[in-house]
Amino acid sequence: MSAHATGANPFADTEDQAALRQLARDVADRELAPMARHGDETEEFPQWAWDGMRKAELFGITIGERWGGAGLGDVEAAIVLEELARADVSSAILAQLIFNGPPRAIEHLGNDTMKDRWLPIAASGEGLFCIGISETEAGSAVGHMRARLRPDGDGFRLNAYKNYVTGGHKARACLVWCRFPDSAGTKGIGAVVVDLEAPGVTVAGTHVKMGLRATSEAELAFDDVRVEPDDVLLWGDPANSESFKTLISHINHERCGNAAMCVGAAQGALEYAVNYMNERKLGDRTLADLQGLQWKIADMATQLEGARLLLQRAVHMAGPHGTPPALETAMAKTAANLAAKFVCDEAIQLLGGYGFSREYPVERVYRDIRGLCIGAGTVEIQRNFVGTSVLRGATPASDGWKSRRA
């Protein structure tokens, strides 16, 4: 995944991955970067980015060949998301929703009818997909959700109000987490796929945000929406939490994508700061000649590369068609979120007043990163999981983590 991977690096891009990286970088530089400021200022859906990614046939990389995709895995998804986010995080999120969102869940967990209906639409870029999990009183505490199915003949009726649905105002279909009949807590939580053109679905509003402004967060209302048996992605058994655990496990794809976007965005901010320091004159010297500022760059680069390596390990452990392991994924997302926030904050400081100005991209990247630190499970949620896992004896894949308990 590293742009400078050579020699014995176990995570070096293959020839095909290097070509994919270059394709994504070309799309990012040509289609995303020139319009990133416009999307941020106007909050306009980045149709230019969508069209550019669709023309380059990027949307289908993680979808099976049977449905028009390339059948690649988390490594390739991370490569593309890193390069796209280096130019514009808001636009990269559109690809994230296809690579690691509902289409991937549909392919892994759905029935054949569902796959044949939705996956060609995703692979071709014909339609956007979104996921409805959060509610007013159920964000990180998913077990408090109120979205519920009730029996209706041979199918169901869905009643739900979902909050912070990324891309919900433009999506064709939504993967909705909900309670199946007679369930409580995390028991009986499953998921259905809803056509957003179905009767009873309304976009109830959108949020005005600090960052990620070109990608809206919608509020979606589902009022007695008919759900056919073939629309059920994962049945929620009220006797146990197995379906909930399966859904949570699937979010590891999204968390790795989140980490990849953080790495890419931070890389862009670091490169901008380095270029500025090499050009900014102080008499006969540049900012790059000052030792104290060199240390800042050293810390930025070191934290960024550490996060990149944790991400690379997590996605490589997933294999071509598996799921990234939970502990390594949580570590990667935590490290990438914190590193990106640190790098962007320091980049603003290095640019001084220019860094604080909207005429320059670094402040926008910082605002976008703050959103990524919340989405797909907050940093605090990841830390909770890592901390409790280690205390209970779980260890990451590194050989140095051998239990020495008696």
What are these language model-derived features?
Residues 130, 144-148, 173-177, 191-193, ...:
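Conserved hydrophobic/aromatic beta-strand scaffold that supports enzyme active sites
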